[in-house]
Amino acid sequence: MNGRRPRFTTMLAASAVGVYLLVVAGATTSIADAVHACSTWPTCEGPILGDVGLAIAWTHRLLAAAVGVLVVGAAAVGIRTGARRRVLGTLAVALVLYPVQIALGAFVALNGAGTPFPGAHLATGMAIFAALVGALAWQLEAETGTDDETPVTETVEVPEVDDDEPEGPPIGALSTRERITATAFAYFRLTKPRLMWLLCLVAAAGMALAAAHVAGPANPSLATSTILLTLGGGVLAIGASGTFNHVLERDIDKRMDRTSDRPIATHQLPVRNALAFGIALAVASLALFWQVNAIVAALGLAAILFYSVVYTLVLKPNTVQNTVIGGFAGSLPALIGWVAVTGSFDLPGLALAGIIFLWTPAHFYNLALAYKEDYARGGFPMMPVVRGETETRKHIVYYLGATLVAAGVMVSITSLGALYTVTTALLGAVFLWAVVRLHRERTEQAAFRAFHASNAYLGALLIAIVVDALAV
């Protein structure tokens, strides 16, 4: 029986991926238009060869039938292997809703898109997907969880740090050229450059979406000056936030292996100089943002203050929900990019920000697992430290599912096309595969694999948004 449980988990994961592909494909305008080329049900009249619309419609219906069989098969295996009641109960919700989804699809095919049924069709599909993700999360918890986890803070001793003792080679012992190079690199490290590419890509996606929204997908308009000022201000804002974070966490950084070599923690740079550097970056950032518009400048200031003060000083050291609430800082670049083009807020920009917000815990909890003891030494109440690894892994599945739902909503309210659909489905499946492996292997390597998969998913999704939105 135990040997069959991994098969049950695999079937649940495959069912979730199949349902998600059906839902986002059905919500994509270009694909949905092709599906509507078939106005009969359950079969389509006319030759498939030479008619792309009929071919897509047939593929969609055959895939729906295959996924339905997979969901039924997963339920049968779950019953036979003695899956937990709440797993089977959640799976039963998907089983009940699946024929409802088929019926709604039939109504859409027979009556056209100008009815309330397409919205109900999408909502029901998302509900089925959510049920399958919930069943998968609980099954993985039952299959791989442990009951003997204790909070790391009870077992890891926090070392005392002498703040007056410098660490590392003194810069004064270097040659003039080496000293200048080392100092410049130390200031560069303060800006947390690894965060810049992804956050700037978020802003770029927001601008591309907005350009398509304002001018239409066939004629997007995006001024070069807007792009340069927005991304330039974003780079400086990220640098300022990172610098302030280094200053405020300098004592804690010395306790953690991952951060003990940071420039201020090792006394490579004086706190006074680093603080002045951060202020200069913030002022320069706001100056660039202000040239775009006042709302962008206000959002940029909010991003700097939220990450530097609210997250670093209030959330991170005091609540286990620091990562979840802290996702607000990462979502602001999406709004900055959108408002830079439109000058106001609208649903697609908010939806993109929502994707980033929900993705953040699914992404960062993997890093928190890999550095669990390090965060405990720093005194941070991260999810693995406070609630254990099993609970953290389960929440990764929850937030991954929520991220994919938000990405599905995005395609239903925009004109994004097949590239976006394929990207979110394919890379979402890879991300889910990495998370399932994380549950089964429970190693640092598996946590890093899931972490990199999360980066790949979001990076590819944002690129797909830019390409799809600006494609002529």
List the model feature ranges, each with a label.
Residues 66-100, 275-317, 398-452:
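Transmembrane helix-loop-helix
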Residues 34, 49, 247-280, 284-285, ...:
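Solvent-exposed interhelical
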Residues 53-72, 117-127, 193, 323-327, ...:
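Membrane-interface loop-to-helix entry segments
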Residues 1-31, 76-97, 123, 127-198, ...:
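Haloarchaeal acidic low-complexity proteome signature biased toward cell-envelope/secretome components but also
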Residues 89-92, 96, 201-203, 209-245, ...:
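Membrane-embedded alpha-helical segments that form the functional core of polytopic membrane enzymes
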Residues 34-55:
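Extracytosolic (periplasmic/ER-lumenal) interhelical loops and adjacent juxtamembrane/interface segments
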Residues 201-204, 325-342, 390-391, 451-464:
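Small-residue-rich segments of transmembrane alpha-helices in multi-pass membrane proteins
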Residues 207-231, 284-298, 333-354, 408-420, ...:
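Helix-coil boundary and interhelical linker segments in multi-pass alpha-helical membrane proteins
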